[in-house]
UniProtKB/Swiss-Prot annotation:
<dbReference type="GO" id="GO:0008987">
    <property type="term" value="F:quinolinate synthetase A activity"/>
</dbReference>
<keyword id="KW-0479">Metal-binding</keyword>
<keyword id="KW-0808">Transferase</keyword>
<keyword id="KW-0963">Cytoplasm</keyword>
<feature type="binding site">
    <location>
        <position position="217"/>
    </location>
    <ligand>
        <name>iminosuccinate</name>
    </ligand>
</feature>
<dbReference type="GO" id="GO:0051539">
    <property type="term" value="F:4 iron, 4 sulfur cluster binding"/>
</dbReference>
<keyword id="KW-0004">4Fe-4S</keyword>
<protein>
    <recommendedName>
        <fullName>Quinolinate synthase</fullName>
        <ecNumber>2.5.1.72</ecNumber>
    </recommendedName>
</protein>
<feature type="binding site">
    <location>
        <position position="260"/>
    </location>
    <ligand>
        <name>[4Fe-4S] cluster</name>
    </ligand>
</feature>
<feature type="binding site">
    <location>
        <position position="87"/>
    </location>
    <ligand>
        <name>[4Fe-4S] cluster</name>
    </ligand>
</feature>
<keyword id="KW-0662">Pyridine nucleotide biosynthesis</keyword>
<feature type="binding site">
    <location>
        <position position="25"/>
    </location>
    <ligand>
        <name>iminosuccinate</name>
    </ligand>
</feature>
<keyword id="KW-0408">Iron</keyword>
<comment type="pathway">
    <text>Cofactor biosynthesis; NAD(+) biosynthesis; quinolinate from iminoaspartate: step 1/1.</text>
</comment>
<feature type="binding site">
    <location>
        <begin position="200"/>
        <end position="202"/>
    </location>
    <ligand>
        <name>iminosuccinate</name>
    </ligand>
</feature>
<dbReference type="GO" id="GO:0005737">
    <property type="term" value="C:cytoplasm"/>
</dbReference>
<feature type="binding site">
    <location>
        <position position="174"/>
    </location>
    <ligand>
        <name>[4Fe-4S] cluster</name>
    </ligand>
</feature>
Amino acid sequence: MEKVEELKKEIERLKKERNAIILAHNYQLPEVQDVADFVGDSLELARKATKVDADVIVFAGVDFMAETAKILNPDKIVLIPNKRATCAMANMLKVKHILEAKKKYPNAPVVLYVNSTAETKAYADVTVTSANAVDIIRKLDSDVIIFGPDKNLAHYVAKVTGKTIIPIPPEGHCYVHKKFTIEDVERAKKLHPNAKLMVHPECNPEVQEHADIIVSTGGMIRRACEWDEWVVFTEREMVYRLSKLYPNKKFYPAKEDAVCVGMKAITLQHVYESLRDMKYEVTVPEEIAEKARKAIERMLEMS
């Protein structure tokens, strides 16, 4: 405990010295969330990244999030505390998948989940997050949409909007959300009969069908006030975030082992060393950044 408190003090000192800000995703370890200047979902973090006046952004999240921050802040130093903080789903989508889909559906816009690499974002007409995917896709003047890389979010968007969504790659998924099953739903209802189920749209369709609400992590925070007990179908650390914001409500993880290894690759020690040694700096080639920036900025304009 003493070491944790000591690290927190050193991080605060270094933040002032470097004129740095720490942005953290909702899935980060509790102690990392505690030292962050801002904690949020992908959309909230992207918006925050456009309003940062610090010289240095330390991004406690996975690599595609840090890339997005760099794309939106080309003149700032963006650091990711651990290079192993990566997103398996983002890495499933390759440029070839986009080009193949465009051959089949030349008039369909390419909509990419922000959980994608900078390289693939350069081929997108617009990016989306789980918080704004439905609204943005509704606004697009096309009934056929090429969408990647999460097939479960694609399923949810298709169901809500009535549009034809072409998922690329066909089996793109988040391994954490894919873990949730009907058995987990049944167990949750048995263990917590008075609780409602909040489900992330990256979960499997059969789990979505039993949800009381299907929302992004930001949506979970906004709507948690509607009921006193919730079973949370997303990454485990979201329960910490919700419990901190709503101490008088009860939140239960649907699965204790719903853990994103990429998110957990960043510890308090990594954040401290990142600020101390100014590592690891995120770079995005300008020709990729310029194209990807248009897709991200269009998302922010349409949100």
